[in-house]
Amino acid sequence: MGYDSSDDACVYQVSPEVAVIQTVDFFTPIVDDPYLFGQIAAANALSDVYAMGGVPKLAMNLLCVPSCLSLQTVRGILEGGHSKAVEAGCVIAGGHTIQDNEPKYGLCVTGFVHPDRILRNVGALPGDVLVLTKPLGAGILTTALKGDLLSPAARDEVYAHMATLNAKAGQAVLQVEQVHACTDVTGFGLLGHAFEMTQEGSVTIRLHGRALPLMRQARELAEMGVIPSGAYRNQDYVRPHLTLLPGAEQVF
């Protein structure tokens, strides 16, 4: 793997049969519950290995802790992360903790993949079909959480999706021979990640807005203007490469 694309992780081949996938990801809390935060952060970090076609096997905790944070809260975060690692069949073998002004948590993850089965986030070909394995809208809903704008059902839905491993989706991808590009939709949004998929070929991606699966309340909140700041940056990034067809509806 080289430096010419924005792949989800780095890959290093160690033998004709084995390549190592290495990735790291951590962030500040997006939910109040420490255990759930640990689960979400761990699922997010593990996801990059699945997106590359691999299986996570080893991880290290990365934890930033304010001095005011209780031991019970810290334990909850770590136990949440550990629960997702166990579910993934991945061993957390230690980690590193520092004092910081704001709590942050995530994992450095090592996974393995056969060199012939590495998936990249570039290389989409004409005729490919885009498959989404989770509904969209987590960024909008987590922004709404800060203002207490979510119904209990919408809150539970976004919590469940964010804490769900992409393991089953990763396993399904491995059963399909002709997967030309794969990624997990995270910080750059659907449009940003879709644009990346077009970078190693003269292809365009056509999205039908009404066919996209959305989380409960996502559209309603977007129409209210509950938009994370990152969405506007993503919009600016893809705008030169984006064409809205006649009849397409733009919410923001």
Map each language-model feature to its residues.
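Alpha-helical scaffold segments that flank or form the walls of functional sites
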Residues: 35-52
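Glycine-/charge-enriched secondary-structure boundary and capping motifs
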Residues: 69-91, 100-103, 175-252
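A generic local secondary-structure boundary/capping motif
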Residues: 1, 9-12, 47-50, 82, ...
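Short, solvent-exposed amphipathic alpha-helical segments in soluble enzyme
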Residues: 36-40, 123-125, 146-149, 194-202, ...
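Glycine-rich anion-binding loops of enzyme active sites
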Residues: 14-30, 36, 55-150
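Glycine- and other small-residue-rich loops at beta-strand/loop junctions that grip anionic moieties
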Residues: 96, 122, 133, 158-162, ...
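Active-site glycine-rich loop that binds ribose-phosphate moieties when present
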Residues: 108-118, 152-175
